[in-house]
Structures are given as structure tokens and as C-alpha cells.
């Protein structure tokens, strides 16, 4: 299974829209956006719609711990993660799980030919891996029943 499979399932179930925010928006607006969409990260798009960064709940918590309530007035661009780990649609789910676990991050933008095409979370990856294991288990049970 690859990332493309996860993106296709997300598109079927959720519409597949990518939630983004401008780097000039303040952290309070970003927190409201995350809450409204019930998501844990938002991508930041710069000039030409290119990926500039990602802002996660962890980034917001870090800013709040460093600056207190004043952090809510900081711009997203000041707080976002700039060196974003990305993947392609053809990468395997196993590879993505390894990278996310090793890097200790939960969201990964999917980039194809320099264009942002989606965002996957560790929850998406785990859900699809569980479905894959359940399918394999059911196939094995069917095989045993007919043997």
C-alpha cells in the first residue's frame, strides 16, 4: 500500500480538501482554524501556492510555553516548522510510518512534482495499516476454512 491509497480514501470520505493558512496570520487565527476543522496541523502556503511550512498543535504549545498568552499575537510564519518532511504519493505506508516515528512528527505533506497534493497524518497511516492487516487476516481465515 502506498500514500496514494490513503489520499484516495481521504478524498472519498472527507472531500480531500487541504486546509492552509497564510504565514502572516496570527497564531490565534491558526488555533481557531485547527479547532474548526478538528485537525492537528495546517500547511502554510507561500507565493505561488508553494509549501512554506507546517504549523502543528505542538508548535502552538511550544510558542505558548515560551511567550505566554502573547504568543497568540505572533505570526504563523514566526512559529511554523520551516524544514518540512514531505513524501510523494508513491511512497510506501511502511516507509512513511518509519519516517514519522523516527522524526517524532504526526503530519506529512504529500508533494508531487513540486505541488502540494495532500496531507497525511499518523492516524491516517495507522488506520489504513489496521485495515490492511484485518483484510489479510480475513483472507487467511477464509483460506483455512476452505482447506
Predicted segments, located by residue:
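Tandem CBS (Cystathionine beta-synthase) repeat/Bateman regulatory domains
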Residues: 1-147
Amino acid at each position: 500500500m502506498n500514500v496514494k491509497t490513503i489520499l484516495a480514501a481521504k478524498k472519498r470520505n472527507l472531500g480531500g480538501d487541504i486546509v492552509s493558512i497564510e504565514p502572516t496570520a496570527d497564531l490565534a487565527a491558526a488555533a481557531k482554524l485547527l479547532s474548526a476543522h478538528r485537525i492537528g496541523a495546517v500547511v502554510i502556503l507561500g507565493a505561488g501556492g508553494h509549501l512554506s511550512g507546517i504549523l502543528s498543535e505542538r508548535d502552538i504549545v511550544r510558542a505558548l510555553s515560551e511567550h505566554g498568552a502573547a504568543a497568540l499575537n505572533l505570526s504563523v510564519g514566526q512559529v511554523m516548522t520551516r524544514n518540512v518532511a514531505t513524501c510523494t504519493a508513491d511512497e510506501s505506508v511502511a516507509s512513511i510510518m518509519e519516517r514519522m516515528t523516527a522524526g517524532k512528527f504526526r503530519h506529512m505533506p504529500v508533494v508531487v512534482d513540486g505541488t502540494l497534493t495532500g496531507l497525511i497524518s499518523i492516524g491516517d497511516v495507522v488506520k489504513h495499516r489496521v485495515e490492511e492487516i484485518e483484510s489479510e487476516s480475513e483472507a487467511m481465515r477464509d483460506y483455512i476454512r476452505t482447506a
